[in-house]
A protein has these predicted regions:
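Non-globular targeting/processing and membrane-anchoring segments
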Residues: 1-54, 63-130
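N-terminal non-catalytic structural scaffold regions of very large proteins
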Residues: 57-58
Length: 130
């Protein structure tokens, strides 16, 4: 069986709003992605994690936090889309839940993701250009 590979990438970030902070420890992302990998492996999907701290973005709130998480899936021609582009608006502002939604959307319904460079305005309005 040919495995589908999905990579979760975390960029570095700088909090610029003293009134807001993430409600989860973003450093726990590697363990969470490992758990996702274990859940999806038997279905022919591998999920990997890469930390790219040198690519640093400003984070003012939750929508910006979605922008530091990038998903890649070469088999689906998804090069480096931000999480918000893939899931749209977050339902519960739960980062790990949103990452799971994004990964499973790529895994099982990549045709539902707006193509990179499309003219659609994404409702989370993170400013990433998608």
């Amino acid at each position: 069986m040919t495995m589908k590979e999905i990579t979760v990438v975390r960029y570095g970030y700088r909090l610029v709003n003293s009134d807001w902070a993430p409600t989860v420890d973003v450093d726990d992302l590697g363990g969470f992605v490992s758990s996702l990998h274990n859940d999806l492996y038997s279905l022919g999907i591998t999920v990997n994690y890469i930390n790219e701290p040198d690519k640093e973005l400003e984070v003012k709130g939750y929508a910006d936090l979605l922008n530091i998480i990038r998903l890649r899936s070469p088999k689906d021609h998804i090069g480096n889309l931000c999480l918000g582009h893939i899931i749209g608006q977050s339902e519960n502002c739960d980062l790990f839940e949103d990452i799971r939604r994004g990964v499973t959307r790529i895994a099982f319904a990549p045709e539902m993701i707006e193509p990179e460079g499309s003219n659609k305005v994404v409702c989370h309005n993170c400013g990433c250009g998608c």
